[in-house]
A protein has these predicted regions:
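Membrane-embedded alpha-helical bundles of multi-pass integral membrane proteins
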Residues: 1-55, 60-61
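Glycine/tryptophan-enriched, flexible segments
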Residues: 343-354
């Protein structure tokens, strides 16, 4: 009822003084980092059954009538301070996306008495397609917002509608989706080549074809980039060599790996994500069996987030470690020796948003 009153009185942005407390309380990822798992796809407040969706299920956020009560609360809580915009990488690289203006446009459209179209995105709608696809889903806007508006949730839900209902998405994504379906990676590379980097190592790397042997402590999830992309392969081989030097017993899945589904999910293709996630979860179950603690080490931040957070929505949880965490532990335990030296070049560490 606060939202109803707010839409009919003239206090405008001042309503955040009252609504912000409720918005913070009902934040989806309460007490968690801004960039967590993406929201499940809901229809009428319930998760969509992807194996047998109902005829009247709504896929994503397409019209102002699809906006949830939490969405309206987000929009009416906006202080218009612009902190989200000031941290947005898309905005700083001259893309048309401003998280602040997007939330304001959605709010004005939702509260308007008369509109040219009910749609949220497209011709005569408040949000242009280019705006929607400029988002990197990094979560900086959510992290910076003083009233915990969840911009990324709304953007991804609108993408879901555009992909699954309207089939309106950048042409480049069409190829990516096909490659993920057919080859299990974004580039359409041969699945057999996932083990190519192993042949370039001068030490043994165990590839498991069934259940993980008891003596193996860690499953090293290589990921698509780590297996195919030349620069990322250097990281994969370096991490594997360091684990070998430290005496860590690890194994990889090799060609049993397939993409986690992160590119599909963040691009709005929730159906494809669910297929890839289900396939990987079955592989994990076969690999870990009845093991209590299931340790997975990754180099890719996207794999780290998707497997560690998004897969948990399906009820399957793993103990995820980024390779930097494990290497740090090995150094502290004395299993890896470092030899400090003065670098003759400047080194920049990219701390990924994921």
């Amino acid at each position: 009822w606060f939202i109803v009153i707010a839409s009919n009185l003239t206090m405008g942005v001042a309503w955040h003084r009252f609504l912000a407390f409720f918005n913070i309380y009902y934040k989806r990822n309460i007490d968690k980092p801004a960039l967590g798992a993406l929201p499940e796809m809901l229809s009428k407040g319930k998760p969509v059954n992807f194996e047998d969706p109902a005829e009247d299920d709504v896929f994503g956020l397409g019209t102002r009538g699809d906006i949830s009560w939490k969405g309206l609360l987000d929009m009416t809580s906006c202080t218009e301070c612009g902190r989200c915009q000031s941290q947005c990488p898309a905005w700083h690289t001259d893309k048309p996306l401003s998280p602040k203006l997007l939330i304001m446009a959605m709010r004005d459209h939702a509260m308007a008495k008369v509109v040219e179209t009910e749609n949220l995105v497209g011709d005569k709608a408040p949000i242009d397609l280019d705006v929607l696809w400029s988002c990197t889903s990094c979560g900086a806007c959510v992290e910076e917002c003083p009233v915990d508006i969840e911009h990324v949730d709304h953007i991804v839900n609108m993408r879901r509608f555009q992909v699954l209902v309207e089939s309106e998405f950048p042409t480049e994504l069409g190829g990516t989706f096909r490659n993920l379906e057919k080859s299990g990676n974004p580039w359409g590379a041969n699945k057999q080549d996932r083990e190519g980097w192993i042949a370039e190592c001068d030490f043994p790397v165990r590839v498991v074809s069934g259940e993980l042997p008891e003596e193996v402590e860690y499953l090293f999830w290589v990921g698509c980039a780590g297996a195919y992309e030349e620069r990322a392969k250097k990281t994969t081989k370096a991490v594997a060599e360091l684990l070998h030097m430290a005496g860590v017993n690890f194994a990889v899945l090799g060609k049993r790996e397939t993409c986690t589904g992160d590119p599909a999910r963040r691009s709005g293709n929730e159906f494809l994500y669910q297929i890839l996630a289900a396939e990987n979860i079955e592989t994990f179950k076969e690999t870990f069996g009845n093991r209590g603690v299931k340790k997975v080490v990754v180099t890719c931040p996207h794999c780290f987030t998707t497997i560690g957070k998004d897969y948990a929505q399906s009820g399957y949880e793993l103990q995820m470690l980024h390779h930097t965490q494990l290497l740090n532990t090995l150094v502290k335990e004395g299993k890896l020796k470092t030899s400090p030296h003065k670098a003759d070049q400047k080194i920049t560490f990219h701390d990924p948003c994921y």
